[in-house]
Regions:
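Fold-level signature of zinc-dependent metallopeptidase catalytic domains
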Residues: 17-45
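Short boundary motifs at domain starts and secondary-structure transition points
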Residues: 12-16, 64
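Hydrophobic beta-strand segments of well-ordered beta-sheets in folded domains
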Residues: 16-21, 72, 150
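Metzincin-family zinc-dependent endopeptidase catalytic domain
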Residues: 40-147, 157
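Metalloprotease/metallohydrolase-associated module, dominated by Zn2+-dependent proteases
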Residues: 98-119, 127, 143-198
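Sec-dependent N-terminal signal peptides
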Residues: 3-12
Length: 198
């Protein structure tokens, strides 16, 4: 019986689509330019693992040995004010992927976000984490939505953006509780599973 269960588990793993990833190390020079921290890579990993958990066994994420082998690549960027992140399509070994650019410097995201982040470092981690989740959702194939509850909500629809992040922040007891709160809504989850059922 144990062998049968083990076989079924292995078969389930084999059916999952693997998405390899690579996350840019935050060097001292990059930290000065972008505002990243060495701990931000962990937020990126948690974001990808959140999609894995939400996929009902359809998606598996795994670290790539090299940047150019990764289907999802996360970079710490700096640039246009109020642009939280961006996902640009790439093709890796004939398979769809994305280069993701995340802005970790709260000062570039406007005075309201910056003011809260300065008072509360965990709010800053919330913004970086949820941006990683949102942009990696695009990488996997999820579009924007107009529903404020969704991680794939587009800020182009307006709303209280500080509160968008604030409601998530209030669910956290500490940074280490982030993996327990994916930020992914039931509607996001349904759309994710539908992608892999096609």
């Amino acid at each position: 019986m144990k062998l049968l269960l083990a076989g079924l588990l292995l078969a389930g793993c084999a059916l999952a689509e693997t998405w390899s990833y690579w996350i840019e190390p935050c060097t001292a020079e990059l930290a000065k330019q972008s505002g990243c921290t060495s701990a931000d890579a962990e937020l990126g990993v948690w974001a990808l693992e959140a999609w894995q958990k939400a996929s009902a066994g359809e998606l598996r994420v795994a670290a790539a040995s090299e940047e150019d082998r990764a289907r999802i690549r996360i970079y710490w960027a700096w640039g246009t004010q109020s642009l939280y992140g961006e996902a640009r399509s790439i093709v890796v070994d004939g398979r769809r992927g994305a280069a993701i650019f995340v802005i970790p410097d709260m000062a570039r995201l406007g005075p309201d976000i910056d003011a809260v982040a300065k008072r509360d470092p965990l709010f800053r981690d919330t913004v970086v984490y949820l941006t990683c989740v949102h942009e990696s959702g695009h990488a996997i194939g999820l579009p924007h939505t107009a529903q404020f509850a969704d991680i794939m909500y587009s800020f182009g629809f307006g709303g209280d953006i500080v509160e968008y992040f604030g409601r998530y922040r209030r669910a956290l007891a500490s940074r280490q509780s982030i993996p327990d709160h994916s930020g992914i809504s039931p509607a996001d989850r349904d759309k994710l599973v539908a992608i892999f059922k096609k």
